Structures are given as structure tokens and as C-alpha cells.
Amino acid sequence: EDGSKLVDADGMHMLAIFVGTIVALITQPLPTASVSIIGLAVAMITKTMPLEGSPAPALAGFANSTVWLIVAAFFISEGFVVTGLGKRIALWFVTKLGRSSLGLAHGMAATDLVLAPATPSNTARAGGVIFPIVKSLSLLAGSTTETEESRRTLGAYLMMSLVLVNTVTSAMFITAMAGNPVAVDAAKALNTPVDISWGKWALAAAVPGIVSLLLVPWLLFKLYPPTR
């Protein structure tokens, strides 16, 4: 049987709009926001996504409280970067905990934990705030990427710790990673009796998350120790 007959006309139209939007997002003829708005407009103009109903299918995403939670978190995270507050927090933890290599790793972990609830991009959090601090600390210790011996001085340990800790903090809050709200919506679609709120997610992840943040740098220190 022809597979196309299993999809109605609106479904095929939506597929065409979706593919076109994805191609535009990849090739970037316009900024991401403009491409997204144009894609939505085309879907509404062609009536692929109607404006009738409550909420209207074309605008249903704007009625999702989780979406607005993520939007607010993006605004706050931009403030961390622009004002330099994120770096100030990182440096404060370094001054308090940075008496050893393990202390530096725990300081970076604490920074990630503080920033995670308001930074829905784990890449931006790690690469935009914490990585520059780790790089500076590594260079101060004479650790560069030129040789394996130099990397093992301090930089390799801190970078490995940064990556592993970032994975932990990304799972601790709904707003710590863009994929988490998708998981919440998927759970709702299954009609489960549990309503996963921001607080419930954070409470459920608190104990395993904090234990992991304490153990990961320590275990890495034992398995992949810096030479300084």
C-alpha cells in the first residue's frame, strides 16, 4: 500500500513546511527567530494549522506554561552573561574552595549548580560561563593542550569534570536543558496521573544530583588525577 495514502493532505502540507523550516534553520538565510515566525505564518496562511479552537492549534504553544518558563529562564541566563554575574559567582567559589585541584573542580560544580535553574542551555552555561574560568585556571597552572604531560597538569582534569558535572546539573531542573520540557510534555501526552512541575522535578533530582556533584569530581580525581 502506498504510504502517502496513510497521511492526509494537511499532514503532507505540514511535512513540507516542517522540512522547509528545518532547511532554513540550517542554512540561516534569516535569523532563527525570523525563520520560525515565517514558518508559523505559512502554516496559518495555508490553513494547515487553523486559528479556530481554544486554544487554536497554531497558537497552542504560546499557551504552554512550560514554554514561558523556558523563555523567562533564557532572559535570566542572558543577564548572567551580559552582566558578568556568572563569572563573579564562579570566581567567588574558586576563592572559597580553590585551595586544591579537587577544590577547584567542586567550585566549578557549585557554580554550575547555581546557574543551572536559570540557564536552559547547558552548552551556553558550560561554554559561555564556566569554560573561560577553567581555561584561565589551567593556563595559570601551566597546563596547555600542547602535550599530554601539560594537559594532565590540571586542564584535562578540570575539563573532564566540567563535562561530567554539566551532564548532572542538566538533569536536575526542568529549566537546566532545552530537552527537559520536551520530556515533561511527553509525560503529559501519556495521560499519567502525575503532574511534573518545576518544584517536583527539582525535589526528585535533588538528592541524586547533589550526591553526584560531590562524588563525580572526587572519583575523577582518583581515576584521572591531575599532576599538580
Walk through the language-model features, giving the residues of each.
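Short hydrophobic alpha-helical membrane-embedded segments
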Residues: 8-17, 102-108, 155-159
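Transmembrane alpha-helix interface/packing and boundary motifs in multi-pass membrane proteins
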Residues: 23-31, 111-121, 163-174
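Alpha-helix N-cap/helix-initiation motif
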Residues: 8-12, 30-31, 65, 119-123, ...
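Membrane-embedded alpha-helical segments and adjacent helix-loop junctions characteristic
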Residues: 34-147
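Short, amphipathic, aromatic/basic-enriched membrane-interface segments that mark the entry/exit
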Residues: 1-10, 93-102, 147-153
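Hydrophobic transmembrane alpha-helices of multi-pass small-molecule transporters
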Residues: 1-69, 189-193, 200-228
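Juxtamembrane and boundary regions of transmembrane helices in multi-pass small-molecule transporters
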Residues: 122-126, 141-156, 160-228
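Helix-loop interface residues and adjacent transmembrane-helix termini in multi-pass membrane transporters
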Residues: 26-29, 82, 99, 195
